[in-house]
A protein has these predicted regions:
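Short beta-strand segments
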Residues: 63-65
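Nucleotide-activated sugar donor-binding and catalytic core shared by glycosyltransferases
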Residues: 1-59, 70-190
Length: 190
């Protein structure tokens, strides 16, 4: 774990006693991968995940916001033995979205993060056998991966660059105006 902040644009905070804040900007996109997840407390699974993260960290900075329980499990499995792995405390929404926006790729098991990466055009790798957000798979912004595939998939996603495909239908940022028109029309008919 690094003792100095990575040189970046917007600060992403950490609390006292954790890794120093990270600075994240889109200029860092070629250098960072980030991950989220609710880690089961299974030492064998943790060891497999740590091995994959170490492979990624050989080429990229890996920034991981972790709940203390997940941090303890992964630390016991040797997570912090790799130089380019940086662990923060859980981040607030705005700070986390800044981290996502500046990442070259995201690894997650969160359905919400799968949607947010699609909208932000950040390649997403979902570390699960399925997703409740299949539109992110069919649109091409997200890919389901196993721990065995993780390192190669992250490096490929970083090499491929930002997601350039079409956003899913109605993901144009205009939900509010559409809802307002429907509600206004409904109220006018009452």
């Amino acid at each position: 774990m690094s003792d100095t902040p990575a040189p970046r644009g917007d600060e992403v905070g950490a609390t006292e006693g954790s890794t120093p804040p990270f600075r994240v900007s889109s200029a860092s996109a070629a250098d960072d991968a980030s991950g989220t997840g609710d880690l089961a407390e299974d030492a064998g699974l943790a060891a497999e995940l740590v091995k994959a993260l170490h492979e990624v960290a050989a080429d990229l900075d890996v920034i991981i916001p972790l709940h203390p329980r997940g941090r303890a499990t992964l630390t016991a499995a040797g997570l912090l033995d790799a130089q380019n792995i940086h662990v923060t405390d859980p981040l607030g929404y705005i700070e986390f979205m800044s981290l996502v926006r500046g990442a070259a790729a995201i690894v997650t098991d969160s359905g919400g993060v799968q949607e947010e990466t699609t909208l932000l055009r950040v390649p997403c790798l979902t570390l699960r056998p399925n997703t409740e957000r299949p539109i992110t798979i069919t649109s091409g912004s997200n890919r389901l991966v196993t721990r065995d595939e993780l390192a190669a998939a992250v490096l490929k996603a970083c090499d491929d660059g930002p997601y350039a495909g079409e956003l899913p239908p109605l993901w144009d940022g205009q939900a509010g105006p559409r809802i307002a028109r429907i509600v206004t029309s409904w109220l006018a008919q009452r």
